[in-house]
Design a protein with these regions (language model features):
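N-terminal low-complexity, Pro/Thr/Ser-rich intrinsically disordered segments
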Residues: 1-12
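Conserved aromatic-histidine-acidic binding/catalytic patches
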Residues: 13, 17-20, 65-68
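Amphipathic alpha-helical packing elements
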Residues: 16-20, 24-57
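Compact alpha-helical subdomains of small soluble proteins
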Residues: 40-86
Length: 86
């Protein structure tokens, strides 16, 4: 599966995300973590991202440091986290 959004390469607006189904918003938020090798403890998220050829689970939650996110990811994650009620 290809990434849902290029959240690491461009700034999105709240309006761009609001038209998406809640599941897509939830996955897009977690895709930012997955891009950096976050190992999901949630089985559904883990299985979804394992189906993505680009996903390489390398870092568990205890060792994950969100300072790895670039400025695009930080801004987009803030919007997605506010919208994610899944």
């Amino acid at each position: 599966l290809e990434p849902l959004f290029e959240t690491d390469k461009k700034y999105y607006t709240k309006e761009e995300f609001e038209s998406e189904p809640m599941l897509v918003i939830h996955l897009a938020k977690n895709e930012i973590y997955a891009r950096h090798g976050y190992i999901f403890t949630n089985e559904d998220l883990y299985n979804y991202f394992m189906g993505c050829i680009w996903y390489s689970p390398t870092c568990d939650a205890a060792d994950f440091d969100d300072s790895i996110f670039n400025e695009y990811e930080k801004a987009n994650l803030e919007i997605l986290a506010d919208l994610d009620t899944y």
